[in-house]
């Protein structure tokens, strides 16, 4: 059963401005070390950061909290499965909220899709509860 859905659009130009203006202060506040390493390896850093930013916003919406109630930016990390497919690793307040919305006798599975078509990046997150 689906227990959460979230989507977000992010303007890549806004992320570009944040990278230029705030640099590491911005990236260290919002992104995990793994996300920074992956995005910083790319020639076009801003679209990579924008996709991840959109995924975090979409995940916070799917959790039903937004960026509140103990859910922080770095509690949600975009990682890739061995197949290359993206997913989200939740820790801290995000993991606690996921546990709170997951029905007893079920386990949560987080699906994410990312795309960009400049000047926009987009993410959709679906949280599914599967019987154990």
Swiss-Prot record:
Enzyme nomenclature, EC number: 2.7.8.7
Keywords: Cytoplasm, Fatty acid biosynthesis, Fatty acid metabolism, Lipid biosynthesis, Lipid metabolism, Magnesium, Metal-binding, Transferase
One Pfam family recorded for the sequence: ACPS
GO terms (BP aspect): fatty acid biosynthetic process
Reaction(s) catalysed (UniProt annotation): apo-[ACP] + CoA = holo-[ACP] + adenosine 3',5'-bisphosphate + H(+)
UniProt binding sites for Mg(2+): 8, 57
Keyword match Transferase: yes
Needed cofactors: Mg(2+)
Subcellular location: Cytoplasm
InterPro entries: 4-PPantetheinyl_Trfase_dom, 4-PPantetheinyl_Trfase_dom_sf, ACPS, Ppantetheine-prot_Trfase_dom
Name of the top EC class for this enzyme: transferase
GO molecular function, one term: magnesium ion binding
GO CC terms, sorted: cytoplasm
Family that this chain belongs to: Belongs to the P-Pant transferase superfamily. AcpS family.
Record-linked HAMAP family: AcpS
Summary of the function given for this chain in its UniProt record: Transfers the 4'-phosphopantetheine moiety from coenzyme A to a Ser of acyl-carrier-protein.
Name of the protein this chain belongs to: Holo-[acyl-carrier-protein] synthase
Organism the protein comes from: Methylobacterium nodulans (strain LMG 21967 / CNCM I-2342 / ORS 2060)
Origin organism lineage: Bacteria, Pseudomonadati, Pseudomonadota, Alphaproteobacteria, Hyphomicrobiales
The gene coding this protein: acpS
């Amino acid at each position: 059963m689906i227990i959460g859905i979230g989507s977000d659009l992010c303007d890549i130009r806004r992320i570009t401005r944040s990278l230029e203006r705030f640099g590491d202060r911005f990236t260290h506040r919002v992104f995990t070390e793994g996300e920074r390493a992956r995005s910083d390896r790319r020639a076009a850093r801003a679209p990579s950061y924008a996709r991840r930013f959109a995924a975090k916003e979409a995940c916070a919406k799917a959790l039903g909290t937004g960026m509140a109630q103990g859910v922080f930016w770095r509690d949600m990390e975009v990682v890739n499965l061995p197949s290359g497919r993206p997913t989200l690793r939740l820790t801290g307040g995000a993991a606690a909220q996921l546990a709170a919305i997951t029905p007893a006798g079920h386990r949560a599975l987080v699906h994410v899709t990312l795309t960009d078509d400049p000047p926009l990046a987009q993410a959709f997150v679906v949280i599914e509860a599967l019987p154990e």
